């Protein structure tokens, strides 16, 4: 008798439901419904409402926290769901983390410091994750080393390059700026992809920055900025201080316009600060943290804010995984 393989499906917790639905549509996959039942005292239970036995399941959860659901609570709910799916006999449980909270703490900077990203990796593995797909994690090397299960590290850079080529003034003299030394490699990759696809000359600059107890200092700008458009690129905007500091330095260096492109915006206050900064002409972000930006803020931004969906990137990745196609091309050029 031929073996029957049940179809793969996407699973999403309520706080990530819109993102999970969008990823399922992009991937052409069905959904596995779950029950989320709260109890008094903050306790809850999670269980699949259909058979999970033998199925490959893709579990979507952004770990960007809010006042109502902090990152720690979202992580705990994800862990409980993974254990429930494992107990229900799911064959594979691949976690999709559009935003990986706790990933910034990937090394020790003081005695007895925790390496929190590794602790989270151990929790996910213990709960039954069989694979993980992340997006623009703060330190890709630390991300890879933290896990023993297979991982895929996606990048929003090709999407951002495509957006800039088709929706921004890509014909201007442009310099890609890293707001700190640690982001130079990211800025260099963006510059190379943009130059290759536009056929034009794209400059590279970086800002020397120091951070101590949350205070950003330093401001030496290395690179050609005067008379050019500066595109400040970063993986994450928390408070907005670093990006605003870099934008001001670019203006002082003679940039005619300063644009900002960032993947993750886990705090609404950070986006609000960018919108309120007079030195910044335009801001491009992704929705990796889900629908956290209030409509009032989006209206206040008018045409100064572009919001790029990450569901097509995750959906295309799942399609390629399920058809044994390579994922690497998605990291080099966004499909037209």
What residue ranges belong to the model's regions?
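PRPP-associated nucleotide enzymes
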Residues: 1-336
């Amino acid at each position: 008798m031929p073996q029957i393989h049940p179809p793969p499906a996407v699973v999403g917790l309520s706080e990530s439901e819109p993102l999970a639905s969008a990823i399922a549509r992009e991937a052409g996959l069905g959904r596995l419904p779950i029950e989320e039942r709260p109890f008094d005292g903050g306790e809850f239970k999670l269980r699949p409402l259909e058979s999970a036995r033998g199925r490959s399941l893709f579990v979507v959860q952004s770990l960007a926290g809010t006042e109502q659901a902090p990152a720690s609570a979202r992580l705990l709910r994800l862990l409980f769901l993974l254990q429930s799916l494992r107990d229900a006999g799911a064959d594979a449980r691949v976690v999709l983390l559009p935003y990986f909270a706790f990933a910034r703490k990937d090394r020790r900077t003081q005695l007895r410091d925790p390496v929190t990203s590794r602790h989270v990796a151990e929790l996910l593995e213990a709960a039954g994750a069989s694979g993980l797909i992340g997006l623009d994690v703060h330190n890709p090397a630390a991300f890879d080393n933290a896990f023993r299960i297979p991982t895929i590290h996606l990048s929003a850079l090709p999407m951002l390059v495509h957006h800039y080529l088709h929706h921004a003034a890509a014909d201007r003299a442009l310099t890609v700026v890293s707001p700190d030394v640690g982001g130079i490699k990211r800025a260099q990759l963006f510059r190379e992809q943009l130059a290759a696809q536009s056929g034009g000359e794209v400059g590279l600059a970086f800002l020397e920055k120091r951070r101590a107890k949350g205070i950003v200092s330093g401001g030496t700008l290395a690179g050609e900025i005067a008379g050019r458009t500066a595109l400040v690129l970063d993986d994450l905007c928390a408070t907005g201080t670093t990006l605003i500091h870099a934008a001001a330095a670019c203006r002082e260096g003679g940039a005619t316009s300063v644009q900002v492109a960032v993947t993750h915006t886990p705090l609404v206050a950070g986006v609000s600060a960018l919108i309120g900064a007079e030195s910044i002409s335009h801001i491009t972000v992704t929705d990796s943290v889900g629908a956290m930006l209030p409509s009032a803020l989006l209206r206040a931004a008018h045409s100064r804010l572009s919001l790029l969906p990450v569901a097509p990137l995750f959906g295309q990745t799942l399609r390629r995984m399920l058809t044994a196609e390579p994922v690497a091309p998605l990291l080099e050029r966004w499909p037209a």
